[in-house]
Amino acid sequence: QVFDEKAQSTIINNLQKEIKEAKPVSKAVLQYVYIIIIEDYYQRNNYNINKRTNLENQKNKDFLTWTETDFNAQIEKNYDNLLSNENELRNTSIEKIKEIFDISSSVDIKNFSVYDFLAQKKGDHLKSTITSWKQKKSIDFKSEIEIFYKNPDSFIKYNAKKLEDDNLVKLITLLQNNEKYYLNQKNYEKL
């Protein structure tokens, strides 16, 4: 087991180094691989990880000693940075990395970018973490969500900061960004 843990630690450290040195598209793909690895490790070991005590000002780079808070912070940080090179990701077809990931056969690979793939993964993650769909000082929830089903311009102009849940704010902002992009591209099929 000690050998296995050493190997895991080496892989994570090498991956983090590769992420720092990689070009934008490779960096985003490697960040997503990193996220998958640490999420999987956390899921398999969360019973023991959750027993660990959080330490103030801990900047431990050894993921084998991370607490639940450390894992969540790393996952969130990497999801937050995942789409930071939007233009390059949008201009790179998923075809270039289709061998790395399981891409559904229903996906039109010629019209699906690395950005589309990673934005979908980020959106799935955000949806799984949302705890409240309400606005701050919510009065009439039904009328408040109607904005999401109106025309695209109304949706884009919606102030997501009114929402209670930070992850819902991130999700709506991600969707608004996509909506804006496809409106500007006049690609109404993707709206």
Pin down the residues of each PLM region.
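Extracytoplasmic/secretory-pathway proteins
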Residues: Q1-L191
